[in-house]
Amino acid sequence: MKLTCMMLVAVLFLTAWTFVTANVSRNGLENLFPEERHEMMNPEAAKLNNRDCVKAGTACGFPKPEPACCSSWCIFVCT
């Protein structure tokens, strides 16, 4: 019984926390991610299209783990 009550309180707390921390609290979860919806309609505006990668011939690997090679092949030098 105690475990059930604790689980109920936890679920209610997490639900309330989601609504309190929403970007637009008047619409609840409906407008939680408005920017992403816009990016889905216009993929050219998406920030994910601008990949942060290293071009071919640049050193990569152990000393410099980031950013990754554009071709995703790294053998001490991006290929």
Swiss-Prot record:
Cystine pairings recorded for this chain: 53-70, 60-74, 69-78
Q: Which InterPro entries match?
A: Conotoxin (IPR004214)
Q: Name one GO molecular function term.
A: ion channel inhibitor activity
Q: What does the record say about tissue specificity?
A: Expressed by the venom duct.
In which compartments does the protein localize?
Secreted
**Which keywords accompany this UniProt record?**
Disulfide bond, Knottin, Neurotoxin, Secreted, Signal, Toxin
Provide the propeptide boundaries.
23-51
| Predominant cellular place of this UniProt entry's protein | secreted
Q: Quick one: signal sequence residues?
A: 1-22
Q: Which GO terms describe its cellular component?
A: extracellular region
Task: Please report which protein family the annotation says this sequence is part of.
Answer: Belongs to the conotoxin O1 superfamily.
Let me see what the UniProt entry remarks about domains: The presence of a 'disulfide through disulfide knot' structurally defines this protein as a knottin.
Protein name (Swiss-Prot/TrEMBL): Conotoxin Leo-O1
Report the source organism. Answer: Conus leopardus
Lineage, highest ranks first: Eukaryota, Metazoa, Spiralia, Lophotrochozoa, Mollusca
